[in-house]
Amino acid sequence: MQARFHTSWAELPASLQFALEPILSAENFPAMLTAEQVKTVKNISGLDDDALAFALLPLATACALTPISHFNVGAIARGKSGNFYFGANMEFRGVPLQQTIHAEQCAVTHAWLRGETNLVAITVNYTPCGHCRQFMNELNSGSELHIHLPGRPPSTLGQYLPDSFGPTDLAITTLLMDPVNHGYTLAETDPLTQAALNAANHSHAPYSQSHSGVALETTNGKIYAGRYAENAAFNPSLPPLQAALILANITGENCASIRRAVLVEGHNAVTSQWDTTLATLNALGCSAVKRVTF
């Protein structure tokens, strides 16, 4: 079991520990539970979906990376597939606070990167800020996404964000988590570049059409790819680097262990991820950063 879970693990009920131990002790635990694992854990622990999501929050919170605020937030995104996905907030020294990732953004993006195509609920240990409410408003779940908070009855996103502005106001019909493939190609055969290209092809950028993807290679040779997630309100858009860092951190990778990185984007796109990607990666200690355009 990863060391970051030890403190939270000790506080779990014995029945839940018994149910989760084989899952969390796996060498490459991906910070998610499959639908089958969720079913098994519920049968052993006696918890239902809502109670299990709340019980998992301390483990998700243990994934937080907060060198600035030291305020850890965890989230569990529940997919229509039945899978549960961990999320936690992430902060980075030496770059603007705008590069911060909120726990809800992390859980949603984690689910998206794992292939989830629709969310039914998100459970979080603190009320979602306005930024996160707007970010989630881009989802194909729409205002019916259920939000669960400790000590409160479940509410919908529509109740947390009344009279919202979203994709439909801009006549956008392809929503975040809808399956897409933009069909871009590159001649380069480098696996890291191809991973970034694949991410760009599945990115969500209906407002600028500036599709982009980032792939990170760590010192142990693992590759983590992230896609751009654009938002109708523009500012809550999540850059592809942040998506890649989400996948790396949530699975237990050290974000300071990135050996090289590739950004793939359009050569004449109206917005570019290059400057912020380079600056953030440099702050994390990675200088081998490459930009490839289609």
Swiss-Prot record:
Gene3D superfamilies assigned to the protein according to its UniProt record, in alphabetical order: Cytidine Deaminase, domain 2
Ligand binding (Zn(2+)): 102, 129, 132
Cofactor: Zn(2+)
Reaction equations catalysed: cytidine + H2O + H(+) = uridine + NH4(+); 2'-deoxycytidine + H2O + H(+) = 2'-deoxyuridine + NH4(+)
MF terms (GO), sorted A to Z: cytidine deaminase activity; identical protein binding; zinc ion binding
Record-annotated CMP/dCMP-type deaminase domain positions: 48-168, 187-294
Pfam families xref list: dCMP_cyt_deam_1, dCMP_cyt_deam_2
Sites where the protein binds substrate: 89-91
Enzyme class, spelled out: hydrolase
Oligomeric form and interacting partners: Homodimer.
Protein name: Cytidine deaminase
Organism of this sequence: Yersinia pestis
